[in-house]
């Protein structure tokens, strides 16, 4: 992923870095931000580009090695820096416009309901009391959105493995998107869906513990360092970009490793992880199949034979078209956000991953991992730590029709009844998909007389929609 300078607008997602401090005191932005930004913002967001590639940085290095004062401290050299940064900013702005499209922020004037990870915010249009109610609804939505955990590019962390990478700028956006989804699952499990971050109160220890798990160090269970190590067999490597399927499998491996290598008292991720795909290697065409027997087996293995059904995270990697998502699938994608179990979508534009957390009509609200922030050390014992860089107050959205077709859905089921409810909803969604299901639900696998694996659908509707008539837009994962 290329670092995106002038990312949409000067971000309101705060950072602990003094040079990148953003405004977090204002309420969530509901108006379009200006498409332009001042030179200071350009320099801040482009610092990595300038530092690594500009002739000025080379001049600084040469001066430093020769024992002279760095020439970039002179007035004329600062002028060169400004010009270089401006050129880099313009180039990356044009790149950003091509990849992600022009800046889109805030909420439209539409009164259509908003769905945010399974929670509905109904906006009514009217006078007096109805307008006041709409204001309260929007305020509640803003608070919910800004309480979601944000993961972005970081710089200044310890090298990843045997490499020299101390930053994931330019390539780590899909990994950060995956971190956001997993962090959200932990937040729902440990604090509940109704939890909201309150700046006026000391930070909750469970909340800080979650952030600590995603610190940028090998000591943190779900750091980018450990995710890359767990995903080596799926192509994960520092400096390389991977797709949603590889990231889903890597998280599955990391969660399994965490369970195997730690005792019950110190387990960081106390939920099972199950990947829903067409086959074990994810290379079967057609809609993926959620087999209830397989999920039950995953839960039994995780609980080591105990009868109590553990919480489970379901990940569904998909490829829904060629260059962009086929419009037939968009209604179903929108509907998944109405599920109480919804954890959103890992996806975005081609080559630019984001974490989509909500929908209104045909657009998706998302958290953007492309802002570059300094590393922050969070410890659960320190309730005074500044965690503002893990949250965002700026609402950004993308037209769902422009999404890259390679994406992944996430769902969190707290217990067996929750999973059963999810299966009912998913089966109905497949039945209402007009022959274009995102995935189907079956009760068990069976083999025919020729030894070929088949599936036994949990409902008649599921059987009817699992044929090949409408599978022409699917790709191999």
From Swiss-Prot:
Assembly and oligomerization: Interacts with ATG8a and ATG8d.
Keyword set, alphabetical order: Autophagy, Cytoplasm, Hydrolase, Protease, Protein transport, Thiol protease, Transport, Ubl conjugation pathway
Function: Cysteine protease that plays a key role in autophagy by mediating both proteolytic activation and delipidation of ATG8 family proteins. The protease activity is required for proteolytic activation of ATG8 family proteins: cleaves the C-terminal amino acid of ATG8 proteins to reveal a C-terminal glycine. Exposure of the glycine at the C-terminus is essential for ATG8 proteins conjugation to phosphatidylethanolamine (PE) and insertion to membranes, which is necessary for autophagy. In addition to the protease activity, also mediates delipidation of PE-conjugated ATG8 proteins.
EC number per UniProt: 3.4.22.-
Name of the protein: Cysteine protease ATG4b
GO BP, one annotated term: proteolysis
Biased composition (Low complexity): 454-465
Enzyme type, top EC level: hydrolase
